[in-house]
């Protein structure tokens, strides 16, 4: 199972890619695999403010609905609107096409609380 080494991870199975002061966030391959076929993705509005741990949307699969949790605090600067029409991207391309939101980071220190790829792999038993 892919766990890209350049990303950080949350214990709730979100991945975080940092570029400058913006974090791109999605769910991991492990999470989408556990959920099964994704049929709907609900995402927030641009400019919404999030605190670490806030729910910012949900993914619905044929099995269940799972909340999405903000791994860091900040302001949403972009939302992947393609997922509204193509939720299957979450299964097909969790680390590329299926990014969910981009957040302007408001507290850099929260990045230290995220897991490395090795720590995340250990957590999921890989």
From Swiss-Prot:
Q: Where in this protein does the record say N6-lipoyllysine is found?
A: 63
Name the coenzymes or cofactors required.
(R)-lipoate
SUPFAM superfamilies from the xrefs? Single hybrid motif (SSF51230)
Against InterPro entries, the record matches this protein to: 2-oxoA_DH_lipoyl-BS (IPR003016), Biotin_lipoyl (IPR000089), GCV_H (IPR002930), GCV_H/Fam206 (IPR033753), GCV_H_sub (IPR017453), Single_hybrid_motif (IPR011053)
Q: Does the keyword Iron apply?
A: no
List the GO cellular component terms: cytosol; glycine cleavage complex
Pfam families named in the record: GCV_H (PF01597)
Q: How does it assemble?
A: The glycine cleavage system is composed of four proteins: P, T, L and H.
| Residues of the Lipoyl-binding domain | 22-104
What species was this sequence derived from? Staphylococcus epidermidis (strain ATCC 35984 / DSM 28319 / BCRC 17069 / CCUG 31568 / BM 3577 / RP62A)
Give GO BP annotations, semicolon-separated: glycine decarboxylation via glycine cleavage system
**Could you say which protein family the record assigns here?**
Belongs to the GcvH family.
Q: What is this protein called?
A: Glycine cleavage system H protein
- Tell me which NCBIfam families the record gives: gcvH, PRK01202.1
């Amino acid at each position: 199972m892919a766990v890209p080494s350049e990303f950080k991870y949350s214990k709730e199975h979100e991945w975080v890619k940092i570029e400058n002061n913006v974090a791109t966030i999605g769910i991991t391959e492990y999470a989408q695999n556990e959920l099964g076929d994704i049929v709907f993705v609900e995402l927030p509005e641009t400019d919404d403010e999030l605190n670490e741990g806030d729910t910012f949307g949900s993914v619905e699969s044929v099995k269940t609905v799972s909340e999405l949790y903000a791994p860091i605090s900040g302001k949403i600067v972009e939302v992947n609107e393609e997922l509204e029409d193509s939720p299957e991207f979450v299964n097909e391309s969790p680390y590329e096409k299926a990014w969910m939101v981009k957040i302007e980071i408001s507290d850099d220190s929260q990045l230290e609380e995220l897991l490395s790829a090795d720590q995340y792999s250990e957590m999921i038993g890989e």
